[in-house]
Amino acid sequence: MCIRDRSNSDALTGGYDAETDEAYYERYILRLQTPPTSGNQYHYRLWALEVTGVGGVQIYPLGHGDNTVDVVLIDVDGHPADGELVERVQTHIDPGSKGLGEGEAPIGAYCYVSGAEAVELTLSMTVQTLPDAEQEAVTAAVKAVVADYLKSIAFTQNYVSYARINAAILEADGVQDVSGLTVNGATANVAIRERQAAVLGEVSIRYGAGA
């Protein structure tokens, strides 16, 4: 008997898209530029990136004391890794943080995996729309361009640029102009510390008619 089709009435959740060619190439270049060997920092970074869904890694040697390594994760969207992703990476490198050499890490090396701490950004602004632009679509476009910017700087920059957010909004579909932008109630850059990643929170937009 040949099964031609199969359906599932329940929605599937918790999965990640297959690794893109671009992500694979970046991981390949990383391996060439930062050779992993004998459980060094680059090795832990490589092991974490081998797990589907991981988008970025920070490594902190001796984070929990002697013979320990802290591995901090973001996902492929630049968001702090959730518990399921953290657990898969933990199991891959050092199951249960026991240092028994049952994962990729060598015997006696205790690895502690966690997701980054979220730094939520609340945005408020006035937007002038282009003629015939629909507010709902413009709101979605604004959120998308800001999210893309935050993803691009996750784990690579220690601040969120107020000017870059303003510029990104101006490039959003349907936006003619933006004014009065505040980020977390201010008109300044937002500092991002180690083990942190910026995430987009509430976005409040006041609309005015375009010229």
Label the model's feature ranges.
Residues P36-N158, G210-A211:
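Carbohydrate-recognition loop of C-type lectin domains
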Residues S9-A11, G83, V190:
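Short linear motifs in intrinsically disordered/low-complexity regions
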Residues L12, T34, S38, Y60, ...:
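A generic structural micro-environment signature
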Residues T20, Y112-D132, L170-V190:
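A broadly tuned preference for mixed-charge, low-complexity surface segments
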Residues M1-I3:
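Short, small-residue-biased leader/transition segments that mark boundaries at the very start
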Residues D10-N40, V142-I165:
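Periplasmic/extracytosolic POTRA-like scaffold domains at the N-termini of outer-membrane
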Residues A137-A211:
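An aromatic-glycine-centered, glycine-rich loop/turn in mixed alpha/beta architecture
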